[in-house]
Amino acid sequence: MAKKVDGYIKLQVAAGAANPSPPVGPALGQKGVNIMEFCKAFNARTEKFEKGMPIPVVITVYTDRSFTFETKTPPASFLLLKAAGLKSGSGRPNTEKVGTIKRSAVQEIAETKAADMTGADIEAMTRSIEGTARSMGLVVED
């Protein structure tokens, strides 16, 4: 028989840097999950990512206090800033442009995010990522 789900925990944790300090410790502690077990498993699974890259994770906690977790792809905003070589986006994106990004780089990001996005096709996902870029003050050029 399948285990009964107690709840879900959604977090963004830096790749290879999960530790018991906030926000990981308190979120898992509330559900009674073994924090160190999660940290070791998460760090092992995110070795392939660049250290410090924010990785969204959905943790499924069961009533017997066991858990499973699923990692997602990094946020589009992080990937866009990395591709543009910037630290942060614009505070006023419609008036202040902070950089430019090539459409080919946006397409690559859309392909990376394809597993997590619910777009109909790669073109729709690319347009969605372009919108994110514009809302951050980036100019998308051909």
From Swiss-Prot:
One or more lysine residues are methylated. It comes from the Bacteria. InterPro entries: Ribosomal_uL11, Ribosomal_uL11_bac-typ, Ribosomal_uL11_C, Ribosomal_uL11_C_sf, Ribosomal_uL11_CS, Ribosomal_uL11_N, Ribosomal_uL11_N_sf. One of its GO terms (molecular function) is large ribosomal subunit rRNA binding. Keywords: Methylation, Ribonucleoprotein, Ribosomal protein, RNA-binding, rRNA-binding. Pfam families: Ribosomal_L11, Ribosomal_L11_N. One of its GO terms (cellular component) is cytosolic large ribosomal subunit. The keyword Ribosomal protein applies. The keyword Ribosomal protein applies. SMART domains: RL11. One of its GO terms (biological process) is translation. Part of the ribosomal stalk of the 50S ribosomal subunit. Interacts with L10 and the large rRNA to form the base of the stalk. L10 forms an elongated spine to which L12 dimers bind in a sequential fashion forming a multimeric L10(L12)X complex. Belongs to the universal ribosomal protein uL11 family. HAMAP family: Ribosomal_uL11 (MF_00736). Forms part of the ribosomal stalk which helps the ribosome interact with GTP-bound translation factors. This is Large ribosomal subunit protein uL11. It comes from Shewanella loihica (strain ATCC BAA-1088 / PV-4). The gene is rplK.
